Regions:
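N-terminal topogenic module of multi-pass integral membrane proteins
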Residues: 1-128
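Membrane-helix boundary elements
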Residues: 39-50, 140-179
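Hydrophobic, membrane-inserted alpha-helices
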Residues: 42-44, 104-110, 165-173, 191-198, ...
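Membrane-helix interface and helix-disruption motif detector
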Residues: 45-67, 111-130, 170-191, 203-208, ...
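Generic alpha-helical transmembrane segments
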Residues: 65-76, 128-139, 161-171, 185-199
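Cytoplasmic membrane-interface regions of multi-pass membrane proteins
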Residues: 75-96, 138-158, 198-214, 248-257
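Transmembrane alpha-helical segments of multi-pass membrane proteins
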Residues: 91-107, 129-134, 154-169, 216-222
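C-terminal transmembrane-bundle signature of multipass membrane proteins
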Residues: 187-265
Length: 265
């Protein structure tokens, strides 16, 4: 990040900008990092409707409308107000948790699809998307924070990784069966990340990649059909990185995987 290079911590410039970015504290109490997956699920729902209308739908600026704008604002607000239990740092520990997660993602997707135009075909096309996003949530539910000195073992997470790989494979297969190039390709490209974490010698960096790309890959592919979506994601990403750097000294969110610690076998 250029700010880290040219405005290192401890300099006067860093201190001045720290004061400036503290003005965004109230915005970040809304947990805007959660907006990335929430918006992605929402736009994925709209993608299904657009795909059913036009299989070759691509790079269409006119896909943005007041209905989507309303939902892009409303859903993060409601999510924050409800203090959803599906925090990506928490554990999903029961079948009930998984079912609630599926219902939660399904509702957001169907809202994105526009409830007034929902059909059986829409529901069928939604299934692989929900399966993929469930795989993403399961990946994020694996706690990789070792700052408190606690260790975790690969034997404690390999079952989850198997489920993640299986869900991604199923999502890709169902997408291919539906002739939906979006989810079939997204899931297929994502599969190697949890597969590496499952098969190769255990390392935190494999899980970090699996987490990041569970959101990044679908978001970027959706941006190819909804170009305006890209211009929502980039400013939020840049603002978040600079906010956390100038208020806490950490560069986050990031795709950099520099954690050297290995996971015990």
């Amino acid at each position: 990040m250029l700010a880290e290079k040219y405005i290192p911590k401890g300099t006067n410039g860093y201190k001045n900008l720290s004061g400036f970015f503290k003005n965004f504290d109230r915005i970040f109490t809304l947990k805007p990092l959660r907006w990335f997956p929430l918006w992605t699920v929402l736009v994925a729902g709209n993608n299904i409707s657009e795909h059913l209308n036009d299989r070759w739908f691509y790079w269409n600026w006119s896909s943005f409308n007041l209905y989507l704008l309303f939902l892009l604002v409303l859903i993060p607000y409601v999510d924050n107000r409800l203090k959803s239990r599906f925090d990506f740092a928490s554990q999903l520990s029961s079948i009930t948790d998984y079912l609630k997660c599926v219902v939660y993602a399904s509702i957001i997707m169907l809202l994105g699809s526009n409830p007034l135009s929902i059909s059986l075909t829409t529901l069928i096309y939604s299934v692989p998307y929900v399966l993929f996003f469930l795989a993403g949530v399961l990946t994020w539910s694996i706690n990789i924070d070792q700052e408190n000195g606690e260790k975790f073992y690969k034997k404690d997470i390999y079952k989850l990784l198997i489920i993640v790989v299986a869900l991604s494979l199923l999502a890709s297969f169902l997408g291919f069966s539906n002739d939906d190039p979006m989810i079939s390709t997204v899931a297929a490209i994502y599969i190697p990340f949890p597969l590496v974490a499952l098969v190769f010698p255990a390392a935190i960096r494999h899980l970090q990649r699996s987490r990041s790309y569970a959101v990044f890959i679908p978001a970027m592919f959706l941006s190819m059909r909804f170009p305006w979506f890209f211009f929502l994601l980039v400013p939020l990403f840049v603002l978040s990185r600079h906010y956390f750097y100038f208020t806490s000294g950490k560069i986050y969110p990031t795709f950099k995987v520099d954690t050297p610690e290995e996971v015990s076998s």
